[in-house]
Amino acid sequence: MSVSTALKLCIFFTGFAGIVAEYSLATLATYLLGNAVLQWSVVISIFLLSMGLGSHASRYIPDDKTPLAFVLAELFLSLLVPFSVPIAYHFANNFLHLQTVIYGLSFVIGSLIGLEIPLAVRINNMYEELKVNISSVLEKDYLGSVPAGLLYAYLFLPKLGLPLTAILAGFFNLISAFLLVKVLKPKKFLKFLAIFTFFLLATYAVGHKRITLYEEQKFYGEEIIHFEQTPYQKIVLTRFGKHYSLYLDGHLQFSTLDEKRYHETLVHVPASFLKRYEKALILGGGDGLALRELRKYPFGEIHLVDLDPKMIEFSKKNLVMRKINENSFYDTRLKVFSEDAFNFVKKTKEKYDFVIVDLIDPRTPSSARVYSLEFYMSLKNKLKEDGIFITQAGDTFYKREVFCSILKTIKKAGFYAYPLVVYIPTFGEWGMVIGSKEPLNFENFELKEKTEFLNRERALAFYTLGKSLECPNVEVNTLLKPVLIYYYYKIQN
């Protein structure tokens, strides 16, 4: 194999590895720091800046040292990219240190990636004329980037998970280093260094699960009994003593210590106002806990919409989850749809008596859609005239603007809106909003089913507390102006 051919293969592999490295660090930042839009923007921007600086720095490398510099850059990348995952998790419980570590890693890795193309062009300059040299090097870099981006989204992250994906990127960098070592025949120390790097990376690849589990358990502070990366999210179930907690992408969804406070309020307060029990819809609620409470009512049909079929499978088959949700997914009245909730509401021809919106907080543009004016207007058309819906509306203490914006948006859609605030020890003061086409009378409120935590007095107290909250001057959340994302991260930032 000629040096020029080997070099072009190297550039293809480095283009592939570079995109995987960028996406892996952006995903890692999202998992640990939150705010997907912000983290992807910041990490990719840091990469672009550092790649430019790396390209600039390449001019100071003497011509006779360019092959050595290229190989060393690939060897460093082959270790730095894979090890960035456990390094970041090690600092996961310190927000300021974590930001410095992730952004610092992005800068260093980006700088090394920035060296690649200028060095490759200079090495290849001996074998091809300038116009062919530059175009062929850039061509191979771009061609390597395209499959990397697609495979990352559709295969690597959902099937391999983040740690193994980063290891894969490292091996592509290592292959590039070995190719150049083979054709350039450098000094023995470089061959030894390449072999040593291979053994380090291979050892980490074999033991990465143990290392990752150790760092993950430090992050969650509890024993991890189930860990799964799906195409949509990372599912983690933990145990602490007799209690279990579920996390999605690092965010707590429930703890068995107090989840009934949330789910009983979410279901039984609005359900007690219903005049008919024919057809119900749950949007989200893939853990089956809202469904567990809803099954107590004599609905003829229950539809549940959750984007992630793996979440449904986990909740249906995992023995711990089955015990918590009381085998709710085996109810014969249930029909599950693995679809996006926003799109389902928009296209369905069904009319419902009761709708429960039990979805994640509006942390991203995608999740903010199901708290938008357009969504609530679509939902209004899917409710019967005496139908009722309820949505979770987030933390009312630290993120009151989020709660107030959701409340205002529901009113803007033409609903009668009734705020509830329930205290949940693991979450704090948590808001919910009931929406109805007809006015509801809380003075005559009576629970229709037996509950473990909820009673009439508590339900009325939750409504009284909800009404008493003073809302700041917030905007309505829309698709074109998703203000909820700004409100959600305002306190944290």
Swiss-Prot record:
Per UniProt, the keywords (alphabetical) are: Cell membrane, Membrane, Polyamine biosynthesis, Spermidine biosynthesis, Transferase, Transmembrane, Transmembrane helix
The pathway it acts in is: Amine and polyamine biosynthesis; spermidine biosynthesis; spermidine from putrescine: step 1/1
Q: Which domain of life is it from?
A: Bacteria
Please report the stretch or stretches of sequence annotated as the PABS domain: 202-437
Q: Record's GO cellular component, any one?
A: plasma membrane
Where does the protein end up? Cell membrane
Catalysed reactions listed for this entry: S-adenosyl 3-(methylsulfanyl)propylamine + putrescine = S-methyl-5'-thioadenosine + spermidine + H(+)
Residue positions annotated to bind spermidine are 263, 287
Q: Which family does it belong to?
A: Belongs to the spermidine/spermine synthase family.
- Protein's UniProt name: Polyamine aminopropyltransferase 2
